Amino acid sequence: MQNPQNLIWIDLEMTGLDPDSDVIIEMATIVTDSELNTLAEGPVIAIHHSDEVLARMDEWNTRTHGNSGLTQRVRESKVSMAEAEAQTIAFLEQWVPKGKSPICGNSICQDRRFLYRHMRGLENYFHYRNLDVSTLKELAARWAPDVRDSFKKGSTHLALDDIRESIAELRHYREHFIKF
């Protein structure tokens, strides 16, 4: 069911914001058609890291990932970074030809930085373009704050939830902000 018009949505949870010193601890993907209808949800993967790595998280990440249960899932996971990358690529190959979909999500440049540093094969699977919902959020904040404020996110900071919210947010901006 590969279609070059399908869109790949991805979200990563990390131990921090610096791809040189922090690591990916969770990833998820969703493939939609060009109209933002979900076609398939990819694997949701907690990536194993040692307690030593997890101990380097700052207070915000320690609290957030601890409260969501992600830290415990990372400790219990048997999946390595390389295995997570391979599983994700295998899923994407069923839906989108390599190099066709932009990387889609919220503040997606940050995810792309981590993929470039830690999962180069997956980063190379995407087209070089980005479809970043946060661009519309920033424009709406300046040009139509009521439109931005009328969309509320749950902010669970779990990868699959974050992707679902990003897709819903783009639908919101398509309906209320983008004029055809």
Curated annotation (Swiss-Prot):
Localization annotation: Cytoplasm
EC numbers on record: 3.1.15.-
Alphabetized InterPro entries for the sequence: Exonuclease_RNaseT/DNA_pol3, Oligoribonuclease, RNaseH-like_sf, RNaseH_sf
Any matching Pfam family: RNase_T
Domain Exonuclease: 7-170
Active site: Y128
S-S pairs: none
GO BP, one annotated term: DNA metabolic process
Record SMART domains: EXOIII
Key words of the record: Cytoplasm, Exonuclease, Hydrolase, Nuclease
KW Signal (keyword) present: no
Major location category of this protein: cytoplasm
Gene Ontology molecular function terms on file: 3'-5'-RNA exonuclease activity; nucleic acid binding
Chain's role: 3'-to-5' exoribonuclease specific for small oligoribonucleotides.
Family of the protein in this entry: Belongs to the oligoribonuclease family.
UniProt cross-references to NCBIfam families, sorted A to Z: PRK05359.1 (NF003765)
Protein name according to UniProt: Oligoribonuclease
The species this protein was found in: Pseudomonas entomophila (strain L48)
Lineage summary: Bacteria, Pseudomonadati, Pseudomonadota, Gammaproteobacteria, Pseudomonadales
